[in-house]
Amino acid sequence: MARERIRVKLCGFDVELVDQSSRAIVHAVQKAGAEVLGPIPLPTRMHKFTVLRSPHVNKKSREQFEMRTHKRLIDIIEPSQEVMNALMGLELSAGVDVRIKQ
């Protein structure tokens, strides 16, 4: 018999915001009385971009930029209506993308 669970996935560019949001979600869910697994850190995705410093000369002179995407996974085991209300009432940072799957 499979246990019902909700999977919350957090993504963001700032690791502190992602961790702060994951702590807020875990605290709210535990306060509502559900079992929580996580936050589980997922691999950080790094995108590197190399561009020319000058628009028309100095081909060897280049600049590199990096964009890191941090991810966390939280599983909520057998959620109740109180847990769902607690999740919907949370105010999270604008820099964190939250995806909820059932």
From Swiss-Prot:
Protein name: Small ribosomal subunit protein uS10
Family: Belongs to the universal ribosomal protein uS10 family.
Entry keyword annotation includes Ribosomal protein: yes
Any one GO molecular-function label of the UniProt entry: structural constituent of ribosome
InterPro entries given in the database record: Ribosomal_uS10, Ribosomal_uS10_CS, Ribosomal_uS10_dom, Ribosomal_uS10_dom_sf
Assembly notes: Part of the 30S ribosomal subunit.
Keywords: Ribonucleoprotein, Ribosomal protein
GO BP terms: translation
SMART domains reported in the protein's UniProt record: Ribosomal_S10
A Pfam family reported for this protein in Swiss-Prot or TrEMBL: Ribosomal_S10
GO annotations of cellular component type: ribonucleoprotein complex; ribosome
Function (record text): Involved in the binding of tRNA to the ribosomes.
Entry coiled-coil feature ranges: none
Keyword presence, Ligase: no
